[in-house]
Amino acid sequence: QVGDKLSLVNMRDGKEQKLEAVLRRPPESLIHSHMYDKSPPYQIKGGLVFQELTRSYLEAFGKEWQSRAPLDLLDALNNPEDYEEGRKRLVFLSRVIRTPATIGYDQVNNKIVTEANGEKVTDMESLISALKEPRDGLHSIRIDDVPYVIYLDPEASDQVDRALLQRGLPALERL
């Protein structure tokens, strides 16, 4: 159990050493392996669908997911230390719903998000907060691949958000 003490015996240079360790809870992982009893967090803005990366998401690419899932996301799973700096979770643009606000971006998907409206994206909460206020009259979302920055007109994206809710989408975000 977390907090319990564990006695260890170690051999070093032919000599026995006695050590004591306290069991700790493992640190929070950048990428959850699985989520139990909880739906994954998401944010939809103007037709852009953002999620926090999980192993379950990658496994949804099928039996051969380790070769079929997007390479950038697989790299993040296999080398999380390359993506950890300043992040609590890895947020990515999972897909683009074709809407008047997302014209030209419909082929952009499965890209890691680094910033939104000039704010560093550290988890879903930070993305949601950053997208509340556009900068210089536009929403800007920086991703780690071409086109590098996605621009959304705030009025058009708000109109799309209202339309999605009217068509039965239960919510634009879930934490």
List each language-model region with its residue ranges.
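C-terminal recognition in membrane/secretory proteostasis and scaffolding
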Residues: 1-175
